[in-house]
Amino acid sequence: MKPARLLLLLSGCALLLAPAVRCCGPGRVVGSRRRPPRKLIPLAYKQFSPNVPEKTLGASGRYEGKIARNSERFKELTPNYNPDIIFKDEENTGADRLMTQRCKDRLNSLAISVMNQWPGVKLRVTEGWDEDGHHSEESLHYEGRAVDITTSDRDRNKYGMLARLAVEAGFDWVYYESKAHIHCSVKSEHSAAAKTGGCFPGRALATLENGARTPLWALRPGQRVLAMDGAGRPTYSDFLAFLDKEPRALTAFHVIETRQPPRRLALTPTHLLFVADNASAPAAQFRPTFASHVQPGHFVLVAVGSGGLQPAEVVGVRGRTDVGAYAPLTRHGTLVVDDVVASCFALVREQQLAQMAFWPLRLYHSLLGGPGVQGDGVHWYSGLLYRLGRMLLPPDSFHPLGAPRAES
């Protein structure tokens, strides 16, 4: 059997067997411990998330121009007839139902969350696409990229949590703008940042076994880099390949800043980072968390001294754009980047599942070695796993930015 076909067969088996293996235990794989659902914290009045201006690449991106019914870009808008959403439609034109596909997907996801959070209550849209000029100049409502929302019972005590649910549903910017509604917006359909997977900037630094530091873009298969093992201990792990490599891509990153000691890590919103709620948690119990969910007050693991690991409190989260995006894969599935411990994986929330799914690729590299030169773009095996995952895993296993689109 050809190696590529064998690898394809093994990858399918790994994904099919993963749910059963995840039930076995106890295990010492990072992220394997069962944990209660993460507590959702409502947004405060006038708070917005992420904590950057709406029309920056770290949020929904720049304004691209008003869309009119007779313009070429009108075909970018699609109607939303989801029966679980109430549209106010005070203009009686159906305009509030029109939005970009990205906005529609996020809104449909939010509608499910609202019904789960408050049985008998539905999501209500008071404003969607605006063709009448009722909003401020360069409002994303003019492009169908923004909605103003409430709950169907108009209970203002729910609006802070509604805003948090909108963040969780994958809106690129959420603002508790008014006591009468929540404002949500998304990136443009053309935005490269809207399609970003899980990566780090190419100039971010990894630590080699000899103590030298090297930019991620310069990593070569076979080099050993500082990482973390399943017991939460520092180790040096073989670098195998890039799961994604985009040297020229303009990419939106989340920048996580810590103090005591001060560290700064840039990574894409869908990437996994190991997080705890307090500094006393053992390293092995830090949970895999999407970068977009990391908040000030959380603790991450950082490298100190001669390779030791310790917790550091997150004091700031902001957006930044950079050229180049790289997603290294190591044998342990973790990597220390700019002295912060991160996962090699993104899009899927379970570190253990991702590590198991990449077992055939690790075996392939052990037996046959990797290619000398890797081309740009998404690694074929990573793309294959994502397609298999979409068929086999429930949508809520994915980060909202990478979840399969709803069909309503």
From Swiss-Prot:
Binding-site positions, Zn(2+): H141, D148, H183
Organism in which the protein naturally occurs: Gallus gallus (Chicken)
Subunit composition and interactions: Interacts with BOC and CDON. Interacts with PTCH1. Interacts with glypican GPC3.
Positions contributing to Ca(2+) 1 binding: E90, E91, D96, T126, E127
Tissue specificity statement from the Swiss-Prot or TrEMBL entry: Expressed in developing midgut, lung and cartilage of developing long bones in the limb.
Protein name from the UniProt record: Indian hedgehog protein
UniProt similarity note: Belongs to the hedgehog family.
Encoding gene, per UniProt annotation: IHH
Leader peptide range in chain numbering: 1-23
Listed GO MF terms: calcium ion binding; cholesterol-protein transferase activity; patched binding; peptidase activity; very-low-density lipoprotein particle binding
Positions of Cholesterol glycine ester lipidation: G198
Site (Involved in cholesterol transfer): D244
Lipid-linked residues (N-palmitoyl cysteine): C24
